[in-house]
Design a protein with these regions (language model features):
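Bacterial N-terminal signal peptides that target proteins for export
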Residues: 2-13
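Bacterial N-terminal signal peptides
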Residues: 11-25
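Acidic/histidine-rich catalytic neighborhood
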Residues: 434, 510-519
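N-terminal helix-rich structural modules
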Residues: 29-225, 229
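Active-site rim elements
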Residues: 382-389, 482-490, 518
Length: 519
C-alpha cells in the first residue's frame, strides 16, 4: 500500500511527476487537481495517494472562497438568479471530487489514517461552508433575488432551485444573532466530528470481534462450508484446531439461523447487541452528546426538536405527519406480531418437546427457519445455490433496468479502481447515449463500514453545451465466497442489490442545469 496511508492496494502507482497550472497555482502532479485522462474523467485511483487528499481539499476551499468573494462584491440591487444563485450552487464544484473520493475510501476502506484525514477535512470544509451560510452579505443577496422572484420571469426549475438555496440559508442560521452564529459554528463542528467517530467505532467494534469455539459440537447445524470458513478465520489469526466466529461475512447470520446450540446463539447475540457499550469503542456518551447537540441546534434555529428540523425538507414534512402515518398501523402491526410470535413459540415448544420452553431473541431466526421448512417444505438457505452473483447482476438487476428503462450496462476494465473487488460498468440509454459509470463494490472486506448504500463520486452537471456525467457507487457487505468457490447470494442480498440499484438509477436519470435539484 502507499506509504503513510493504507488507502489503496500496494500495486498503486505514485502520481506522475511534473507541474500543472490550476486556478493560478502550481501542483506537482496531484491527480485530484488535474484533469483525469481516464474514461469519463474518472478519478485516477491508480495514482491517488495519501499526500494528495488534503492539498486537493484545501485548494477546493481556496477556490470556493474566491468564488464567494466575487459574489459577495455584488450590490443587492443588481442581484439576479444568474449572478448569485447559479454561482452559489456551483461555487464548491472543485471540492466535489476530492471530498467524494475521501468519503468513498473512508466508507469502503477505512483505517485510522483515513479517519484522521476525514476529521481534518470535516473541520476545514465545515468552517468554510459555515462562513458562507452565516455571511450576512451573502444572505442579503440571496434574499434580494428571492424577494423579486415573482417579477424575475424564472421557470419552475429555477424557482425550485432558488427556493432550496434560500431555505438552506434560513435553516443554516442566516437569521440568527451574531452570538448564535458563533455557537452554531461550534455545534456544527462538534456534531460532524462526533458523528465520524461514532460511525468508525461501530465499524471497528464489528470487525474486531471474534468468538473462538474450541468444541466442534457447538457448531452442529452449520453447513460444512461455514465451518470451514470459521476454521480459516482462526488460522489467519494464528489459531489451529479452533473456529473463529465474527460479526462479518455472514458469520453472525449463519450462527443465528442454523446453529443448534442455543447457548452459542445467545452469546453471539448478546455480544452483537452490546457493541460499543464499553471499552475503547464505547459510543454511549457520544450518542448522548450528538442527540443533545442536535437538539440545541434545532431549537436555536426555531424548531421544537431535531425531528422537526430534519423532516422539514423531507417528504413527510413534520413529525405530526409521521405520527399520522405510523400510529394507525401500530395496533394492527402489534397484533400481527404477537400472533406470529405465539405461533413461533408454540412451534418451538413442540420442536423441542419442552412445554417450559420460552422463546428468546436469539431463538427467532433459528426457529423461523424450521417453521418455514415445516410449513412450506423449503429452506431459504438452499435458494443461495441458485443465486449466482453474476447471474443476479446481469440476468436480474441489469435485465430489469433494460426492460423498464432501456438502460444497458456494460462492464469496463479500463476504469481505475482502488481495490480489485470493485467492478465498473458503463451505463447507456436506449439510444446508446452514455449516462455515466457505476462502481460496484459488493463484498465484505476489513475496514469497510457495515450495511449497504448508494453514493456518488460525482453528480451530473452541465454548463451550456458542456455535460459532466455522474459516477455512481454501490457498496454492500455480501458474504465473501472461499477462494475458488462460486459467489452466491442469499435472498436478502438479492433484495439489497435491487434496492441499491434503484438509488443508482436516480443518479443516472436525474438531469438538469442546477446541482441543487439534480442527482
Amino acid at each position: 500500500m502507499i506509504r503513510s496511508l493504507p488507502l489503496v492496494r500496494r500495486t498503486l502507482l505514485l502520481s506522475v511527476c511534473g507541474l500543472f497550472l490550476f486556478s493560478g497555482r502550481l501542483f506537482a502532479g496531484n491527480p485530484l487537481l488535474m484533469p483525469s485522462e481516464a474514461p469519463y474523467g474518472a478519478p485516477r485511483f491508480d495514482r491517488i495517494h495519501a499526500a494528495d487528499i488534503m492539498p486537493a481539499i484545501e485548494e477546493g476551499i481556496r477556490a470556493y472562497k474566491a468564488g464567494i468573494a466575487k459574489i459577495r462584491a455584488l450590490d443587492p440591487a443588481e442581484a439576479t438568479f444568474e449572478n448569485v444563485v447559479v454561482p452559489l450552487d456551483r461555487a464548491d464544484s472543485l471540492l466535489d471530487v476530492p471530498r467524494a473520493v475521501l468519503g468513498y475510501l473512508k466508507s469502503n476502506f477505512g483505517g485510522d489514517s483515513v479517519i484522521r484525514i476525514s476529521l481534518e477535512s470535516a473541520q476545514l470544509t465545515g468552517e468554510a461552508y459555515d462562513a458562507v451560510t452565516l455571511d450576512t452579505a451573502i444572505f442579503r443577496l440571496v434574499k434580494a433575488v428571492y424577494d423579486r422572484r415573482d417579477a424575475a420571469g424564472l421557470d419552475s426549475l429555477q424557482l425550485r432551485t432558488l427556493g432550496k438555496v434560500y431555505r438552506s440559508y434560513i435553516r443554516g442560521g442566516a437569521l440568527c444573532t451574531p452570538g448564535q452564529k458563533e455557537r452554531l459554528k461550534e455545534l456544527n463542528r462538534e456534531i460532524s466530528l462526533k458523528r465520524i467517530r461514532h460511525g468508525q467505532n461501530i465499524t471497528q467494534a464489528t470487525q474486531e470481534f471474534v468468538l473462538y469455539v474450541q468444541d466442534s459440537s457447538l457448531l452442529d447445524g452449520l453447513a460444512g462450508t461455514t465451518r470451514q470458513r470459521f476454521a480459516r478465520n482462526a488460522a489467519r489469526q494464528g489459531h489451529q484446531g479452533v473456529w473463529a466466529v465474527g460479526f462479518t461475512n455472514g458469520d453472525y447470520a449463519s450462527v443465528m439461523a442454523s446453529a443448534t446450540n442455543r447457548d452459542l446463539r445467545r452469546r453471539l447475540y448478546e455480544a452483537y447487541t452490546s457493541r460499543c457499550m464499553d471499552g475503547k469503542y464505547d459510543n454511549r456518551q457520544l450518542s448522548v452528546d450528538i442527540v443533545n447537540l442536535r437538539l440545541e441546534r434545532a431549537r436555536m434555529l426555531g424548531y421544537e426538536n431535531y425531528a422537526a428540523y430534519t423532516l422539514e425538507t423531507n417528504m413527510a414534512g413534520t413529525p405530526e405527519k409521521v405520527r399520522e402515518l405510523l400510529l394507525p398501523l401500530k395496533d394492527a402491526a402489534a397484533g400481527k406480531g404477537r400472533a406470529e410470535r405465539a405461533e413461533l413459540e408454540a412451534f418451538a415448544v413442540k420442536y423441542e418437546r419442552d412445554s417450559a420452553f420460552r422463546l428468546e431473541p436469539w431463538d427467532v431466526a433459528f426457529y423461523s427457519g424450521k417453521l418455514r421448512k415445516a410449513k412450506f417444505g423449503s429452506e431459504l438457505g438452499r435458494m443461495r445455490n441458485y443465486l449466482l452473483f453474476d447471474n443476479v447482476l446481469n440476468d436480474g438487476v441489469f435485465y430489469v433496468a433494460n426492460r423498464l428503462f432501456g438502460i444497458t450496462l456494460t462492464q469496463r476494465t479500463d476504469i481505475p479502481v482502488f481495490h480489485p473487488d470493485v467492478l465498473t460498468f458503463e451505463a447507456k440509454d436506449a439510444e446508446g447515449r452514455p449516462l455515466g459509470l457505476l462502481y460496484l463494490d459488493c463484498f465484505v472486506r476489513k475496514g469497510k463500514r457495515g450495511g449497504a448504500w448508494c453514493s456518488r463520486l460525482r453528480g451530473y452537471s452541465c454548463a451550456g453545451e458542456r455535460e459532466v456525467l455522474p459516477l455512481v457507487t454501490i457498496s454492500c457487505n455480501f458474504s465473501r465466497a472461499a477462494e475458488g468457490r462460486p459467489k452466491l447470494l442469499s435472498t436478502s442480498e438479492v433484495k439489497t442489490l435491487f434496492h441499491e440499484f434503484g438509488h443508482a438509477l436516480a443518479g443516472f436519470l436525474s438531469r438538469g442545469p442546477y446541482p441543487q435539484v439534480t442527482g
